Amino acid sequence: MPQQNYLDELTPGFTPLLAIKEASRCLLCHDAPCSQACPAQTDPGKFIRSIYFRNFKGAAETIRENNALGAVCARVCPTEKLCQRGCTRSGIDKPIDIARLQRFITDFEQQTAMQIYQPGSKTRGKVAIIGAGPAGLQASVTLTHLGYDVTIYEKQPQPGGWLRHGIPAFRLPQSVLDQEIARIVEMGVNIKCNCDVGGSLSLAQLKAEYRAVLMTVGMSCGSDLPLFEQASHVEIAVDFLQRARQADGDISVPRSALIIGGGDVAMDVASTLKILGCPSVTCVAREELAEFPASEKEFTSTQALGVSIIDGFTPVAVSGNKVTFHHVRHSGELTLEAENIILAVGQHARLDNFAEIKAQHNIIDTHNYQTDDPAIFAAGDIVKGDKTVVYAVKTGKEAAQAIHHYLEEACSC
């Protein structure tokens, strides 16, 4: 097996011929259960039908009308749990490869320089968004379509949030994200980077300048485990992924690594280590395979790279670089040693600087995305729901509509 490069996509895309061939497998269901299963309402049933009839522009328009991050979602969405699970073709042989068809169309859109988005009218007043991650980016597009003048305030030097700083380049190339953001900026969305709302800029200042404010602060901080405080060479998964991403994979890796966790972030860490040349990578999760949190796509690709995945064990003791695990249901014990230990045990947002916003367990209390302050809304990872990119897109769209409804009512009073 040839060596995988960190900057090269792990999964190859479709050629036009292969895309048409795959789309021709579609049963053209009238009720399109695949479309019903998409949280972002990207409508795969409709765009696959367009591919089937060689109407690639129509397919691109369908995707972009519903999902401003269509090219991103095509690469990182857990489609096997969503649209592909709903695919009727599964009852015959296997589901349509919806993700790669969506990727083919969004790549074709870029290659042929399609102009689907048009600049907004900016006649309904100004709205501010805090955070340029997937929820904030999608909300900005929906609000711009509705006629608002939108400014996004981003703490980091570049927009994208977790898409830029956390997801490895072999899953999501930076060029793809840059192209998505360029389209959004061309619509007239203003993105201000290096702006720390809650720090140098207060929420009160934004409220005074804008008709409404949408918070889409992501869960950019990795969690740790007290058990590992005295362990040697421990790193938080979020920090490791960001380090690798910023250096385009040009970082040193250990001879052996032990990852604690079984989600998509743990799989990304394990895959990154393997691709960068770490000979021995082991991932240990407390969940058993039947309830494994990682998507099937990520789990399978990580295993294919040669990562050892152990399920059903939880850490109970640490001594230097040695970790002892107990099985969650049985009496089994396991001790593993590695040069580096990486913790992928969850993430949280920094909400300390937003004391005026009510939050519990890192989730902001909202009603239809509206906080206790009627002019402040929240979406993305900091509201209840799945912590996936496609769900962030969904909440961004819905929060934008909620803001529009609120401002329309305010005008009619």
Swiss-Prot record:
Gene3D superfamilies: Alpha-helical ferredoxin, FAD/NAD(P)-binding domain
Keywords: NAD, Oxidoreductase
Gene Ontology MF term list: dihydropyrimidine dehydrogenase (NAD+) activity; iron-sulfur cluster binding; NADH dehydrogenase activity
EC nos: 1.3.1.1
Reaction it catalyzes: 5,6-dihydrouracil + NAD(+) = uracil + NADH + H(+); 5,6-dihydrothymine + NAD(+) = thymine + NADH + H(+)
Role: Involved in pyrimidine base degradation. Catalyzes physiologically the reduction of uracil to 5,6-dihydrouracil (DHU) by using NADH as a specific cosubstrate. It also catalyzes the reverse reaction and the reduction of thymine to 5,6-dihydrothymine (DHT).
Complex formation: Heterotetramer of 2 PreA and 2 PreT subunits.
PANTHER family found in the cross-reference section: DIHYDROPYRIMIDINE DEHYDROGENASE [NADP(+)]
Protein family (similarity comment): Belongs to the NADH dehydrogenase family.
Protein name: NAD-dependent dihydropyrimidine dehydrogenase subunit PreT homolog
Originating species: Salmonella typhi
Underlying gene: preT
